[in-house]
């Protein structure tokens, strides 16, 4: 079966190649990018999605901006770079990896301010590639840490897509699933379809099915039923931003899943690369929540599913209270409550 990668880099042609996730699972098509404006649109329109993948994509986008910067003196060049960074950062406000990757790129330019601008552009190219490669290693390590919390025969529920399609490879929430498959484990995954954009059915189910993993798609409102039937031993989801106290922003519906998991006594694990942890955001109340187009809710596949003109509330994310989370699993280790103290310790290592 084919391996689906969300992000590819063509080193010879200096182009970013993204899998168009808006047309999955019906078509598998890749789109090439070589401008900051194109990258902005790819993030805004969800050609690429998932916090880690967005961060990697934005890093390449800022390199593309730097590449065509009109300034040859560092002061003017860096001002231009900061403007383009702010522009890219505005594409999707909730995913902290986006601003993290852009800040890393800005810092790399600043570290090399005494060098020729042409050389700095080359350095930024290599930095974007490094961020890309690092994401792959982070995801694999998260999987290695998470699999220690699971056992052969496990039933897993996941929500949205924190898989290979949301990262550079392996995924975060799906990483232990790929590793369990390699170990020959017999396990089952239930994938919430994740309305309104159906990332669970169109993306997670697709990539796991293509990988030969036993996956069953369920509607969002079936989660309580499958939990009550004893089919779920663990809930594993990704995240877009984790506050300093452990409150976690993830795709809309995750909070409801966490409440159900707590009720049924099922562990709730957050798979989180450390760039998704925002120590400067105190609680979930401080996380900006993106509101999306009303037509995502009122129409599907070109057909209206609600009255035209009806009011729509369509937040892209909700915040899972830290009290509902069993553990946050990162590439640096497994973090248990109390999260406020232990997340801080994670960054002191």
Swiss-Prot record:
This is 5-deoxyribose 1-phosphate isomerase. Catalyzes the isomerization of 5-deoxy-alpha-D-ribose 1-phosphate to 5-deoxy-D-ribulose 1-phosphate, as part of a 5-deoxyribose salvage pathway that recycles this toxic radical SAM enzyme by-product to mainstream metabolites. Its EC number is 5.3.1.-. One of its GO terms (biological process) is pentose catabolic process. Belongs to the EIF-2B alpha/beta/delta subunits family. DrdI subfamily. It comes from the Bacteria. It is an enzyme of class 5 (isomerase). Substrate binds at residues 49-51, 92, 199, 250-251. The record marks 160 as: Transition state stabilizer. GO terms for molecular function: S-methyl-5-thioribose-1-phosphate isomerase activity. Keywords: Carbohydrate metabolism, Isomerase. It comes from Clostridium botulinum (strain Langeland / NCTC 10281 / Type F). The active site is at residue 240. The gene is drdI.
């Amino acid at each position: 079966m084919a391996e689906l990668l969300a992000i590819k880099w063509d080193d010879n042609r200096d182009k970013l190649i993204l899998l168009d996730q808006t047309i999955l699972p019906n078509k598998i098509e890749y789109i090439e990018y070589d401008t900051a404006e194109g990258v902005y649109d790819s993030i805004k329109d969800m050609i690429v999605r998932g916090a880690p993948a967005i961060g990697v994509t934005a890093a390449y986008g800022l390199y593309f901006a730097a590449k065509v910067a009109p300034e040859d003196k560092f002061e003017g060049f860096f001002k231009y770079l900061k403007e383009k960074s702010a522009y890219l950062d505005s594409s999707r406000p909730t995913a902290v990896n986006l601003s993290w990757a852009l800040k890393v790129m800005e810092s790399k330019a600043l570290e090399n301010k005494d060098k020729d601008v042409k050389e700095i552009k080359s350095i930024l190219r290599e930095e974007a590639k490094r961020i890309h490669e690092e994401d792959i290693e982070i995801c694999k390590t998260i999987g290695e840490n998470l699999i220690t919390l699971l056992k052969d025969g496990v039933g897993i529920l996941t929500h949205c897509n924190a898989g290979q399609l949301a990262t550079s490879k392996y995924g975060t929430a799906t990483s232990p699933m790929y590793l369990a498959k390699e170990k020959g484990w017999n396990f089952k995954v239930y994938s919430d379809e994740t309305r309104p954009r159906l990332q669970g059915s169109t993306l997670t189910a697709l990539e796991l099915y293509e990988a030969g993993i036993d996956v069953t798609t369920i509607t969002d409102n079936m989660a309580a039923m499958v939990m009550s039937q004893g089919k779920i031993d663990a809930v594993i989801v990704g995240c877009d931003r984790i506050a300093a106290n452990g409150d976690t922003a993830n795709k809309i519906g995750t909070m409801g899943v966490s409440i159900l998991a707590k009720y049924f006594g099922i562990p709730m694990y957050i798979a989180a690369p450390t760039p998704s942890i925002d120590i400067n955001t105190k609680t979930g109340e401080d996380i900006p929540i993106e509101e999306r187009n009303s037509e995502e809710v009122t129409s599907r596949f070109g057909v209206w599913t609600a009255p035209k003109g009806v009011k729509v509330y369509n937040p892209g994310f909700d915040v899972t209270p830290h009290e509902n989370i069993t553990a946050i699993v990162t590439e640096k280790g497994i973090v248990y409550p109390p999260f406020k103290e232990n997340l801080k310790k994670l960054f002191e290592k």
